Amino acid sequence: MKRLILIVVIVMTAISCNAQSDINRATVTSLDVERYMGRWYEIARYDHSFERNMEYCKAQYTLLPDGRILVENSGVDSRNGKFRIADGKAKLGDHPGQLRVSFFLFFYSDYNILALDNNYEWALIGSQSPKYLWILSRTQKLPEVVLNEILLTAQDRGYDTSKLIMVTQ
């Protein structure tokens, strides 16, 4: 029985590692942090508990003189119509396009800018985990042709775009 459990654990670990390696997590090679700051609307996202049932989601990034970044995520809970805000902080990572974001004490999560429009009009965001993916825009709606290009970029990187939830704006 112990041997069977060990085999199952090894197989599941191999499958998990293989599935994660199929995602291209490379970030953009350059980032003008000041230009990235400001308001971003959430166009689409993978489902996760901390944003479940949220609509009209947006993020506001503010660069402080000391290099820290203030983060304010907001949206409306579709179940009760209540406006919710989550205040956090971010810091730059080791590579362009990498940030570390925290909404609770000193617990930070990856925030990887996977693709970014040349004019900073839209961004594709992921993390080291394949469970997270967002499409952000400076406007509440993206032209369909642009959205389709972003979806193809995500698919080419190994993401399952059929799991994306389109966010009501």
Question: What positions do the PLM features span?
Answer:
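A beta-rich soluble binding module of mature secreted/lumenal proteins
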Residues: 17-169
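Sec-dependent N-terminal signal peptides
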Residues: 4-13
